[in-house]
Amino acid sequence: MTDTKFLEDQQILSGDFSGQSLEGDTYIKCQFKNCNFSDTLLRGAKFISCTFNSCNFSLAKMEGCRFQDATFIDSKVVGGAFFKCERILFSVNFRGSTLLYCNFSELNLKGVHFKRCTLKECHFSNTQLSGASFEETDLSGTLFHNSDLSNANFASATHYNIDPRTNKIKHAKFSLLEAVGLLQAFEITIVDL
């Protein structure tokens, strides 16, 4: 049996948790700065109202982890299986962060904010994203399938490819220049005269 930690209102600077286990640990209103969570076991860990600034979550094992009101700033997540996180009260926001090969399928991300982020090859299947904002976010190779994107804001997002036949996009906002990404599924040619 391992001892679990309970920390509240703490600042953790340059913590190297790579390859370690934080299984069952609880962190409330903590600020993590320049921390490394690469290949860290986060099973059952709880991060409630926490901020992650310049942190690395490459290949972190997130099964059963709770991110509740968590904010990621200038952080990196590679292979983040967010769909394996605890779903009750799951809420995250990202600013200036890089997310590669992450999976947000089946999650309720209503109102989530991705601001000045890079989301490459990420998956949003059967995801609730109504009212979400993808401000100044690069969505290269990201898949949206059978997701609710109603009232979502893609006005300053780039490189998205969203099939309107398999996603709800009513009242979503898109820029005229990037709206071509809504037509790719129809295999048509757009000519600029």
Tell where the protein language model's regions lie, with residue ranges:
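Tandem repeat scaffolds
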Residues: 1-193
